[in-house]
């Protein structure tokens, strides 16, 4: 997370200069790319900038992303969803309640996300979490090949719609790698990186 003072300065800059492209950059950096950010406040800033920059397409995109993040922010309950995994079986939010769940995005072109997948698979095999992967590749066959190559055991979803998939929007997942952690039906963490996952694995092995 970003130091609170930096976030405070960024907010003040946006309020003082809603017409500036720098304000758009700061909002993206300190709210969309910052886990645990105040998405409600970010939306207020985006609305302020939109009044001064009505034709800015980036702001429209930020607003859309923030609405999704707000609905699936830390402390909120896991939004309802239904999807099919790559074996054609239904994956429903209602079936995931009361467990520790990690839902993670990945892609064939993102080494970091593949590294995260392998760490998540270890957690899954040790029974520490139920993991669901969402592949954002356009080629479902390529995604299946990678799962088989890396011997990934947990369920994966790949609808071929890349970052425009419905499930990504429902869960507020907008980058690769990205993830949410759900405990007892509530979102408790976002964007846990591979090194943190490995540390947790090391702690389990002690």
Spell out what each predicted region is:
Residues 97-119:
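Conserved redox-active cysteine motifs that mediate thiol-disulfide chemistry
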Residues 112-150, 162-168:
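Structural microenvironment flanking redox-active thiols in thiol-disulfide oxidoreductases
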Residues 152, 159-205:
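Thiol/disulfide oxidoreductase modules built on the thioredoxin-like
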Residues 60-93, 203:
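N-terminal "domain-start" segment that seeds a small globular fold
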Residues 102-103, 131, 179:
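Hydrophobic beta-strand anchors of alpha/beta hydrolase catalytic cores
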Residues 1-54:
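Preference for long, solvent-exposed alpha-helical segments and helix-linker "stalks"
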């Amino acid at each position: 997370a970003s130091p609170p003072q930096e976030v405070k300065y960024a907010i003040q800059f946006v309020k003082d200069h809603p017409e500036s492209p720098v304000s758009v950059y700061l909002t993206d950096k300190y709210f969309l790319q910052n886990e645990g950010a105040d998405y409600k406040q970010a939306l207020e800033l985006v609305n302020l900038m939109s009044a001064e920059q009505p034709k800015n397409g980036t702001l429209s995109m930020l607003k859309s992303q923030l609405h999704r993040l707000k609905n699936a922010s830390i402390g909120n309950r896991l939004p309802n969803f239904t999807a099919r995994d790559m074996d054609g079986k239904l994956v429903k939010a209602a079936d995931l309640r009361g467990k520790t769940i990690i839902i993670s995005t990945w892609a064939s072109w993102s080494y970091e996300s593949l590294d995260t997948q392998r760490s998540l698979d270890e957690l899954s095999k040790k029974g520490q979490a139920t993991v669901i992967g969402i592949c954002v590749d356009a080629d479902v066959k390529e995604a299946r090949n990678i799962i088989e190559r890396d011997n990934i055991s947990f369920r994966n979803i790949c609808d071929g719609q890349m970052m425009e998939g419905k499930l990504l929007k429902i869960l507020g997942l907008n980058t690769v790698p990205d993830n949410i952690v759900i405990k007892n039906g509530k979102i408790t963490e976002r964007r846990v990186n591979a090194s943190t996952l490995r540390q947790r694995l090391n702690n389990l092995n002690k």
